[in-house]
């Protein structure tokens, strides 16, 4: 009996796990060409959103890879060439806050979605961690 609750909770959690993306979901989507200037675009995006963009440390963890993000209650469907970046910005006192993962989606050399970026903590941070792992760069922080 004492194992019934944990087992029930585990089964309920497993039932919530998303199913793998199917070919039907991604069929016909135009990802566009693989981005060439993604690092410049990311730096430009961050330069107007970070507290101290000149001092921030930006680590490009992966090269762009095709990725599809399903629509859920708190996020729209997005697709494109995704890349994982770790960012360490300074706080208002000038101290580094620590690295956090960010995933950028590109189509036709433009950023179309950001998960985990500045101001997108909570669910966005969870998406970024999961997507970085899927892209081959698990966040260890």
Q: What residues fall within each predicted segment?
A:
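Cystatin/cathelin-like cysteine-protease inhibitor module
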Residues: 17-141
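Bacterial N-terminal signal peptides that target proteins for export
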Residues: 1-6
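Residue-level signal for mature regions of secreted extracellular proteins and peptides
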Residues: 9-10, 125
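Exposed boundary/loop context
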Residues: 8-9, 87
């Amino acid at each position: 009996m004492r194992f019934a609750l944990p087992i029930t909770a585990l089964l309920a959690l497993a039932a919530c796990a998303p199913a793998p993306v199917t070919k039907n979901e991604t069929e016909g989507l135009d990802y566009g060409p693989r981005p060439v200037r993604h690092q410049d675009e990311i730096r430009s995006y961050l330069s107007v959103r970070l507290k101290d963009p000149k001092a921030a440390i930006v680590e490009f963890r992966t090269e762009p890879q095709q990725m599809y993000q399903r629509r859920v209650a708190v996020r729209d469907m997005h697709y494109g060439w995704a890349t994982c970046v770790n960012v360490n910005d300074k706080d208002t006192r000038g101290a580094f806050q620590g690295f956090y993962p960010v995933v950028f989606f590109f189509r036709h050399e433009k950023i179309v979605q950001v998960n985990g970026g500045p101001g997108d903590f909570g669910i966005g941070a969870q998406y970024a961690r999961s997507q970085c792992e899927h892209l081959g760069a698990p966040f260890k922080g």
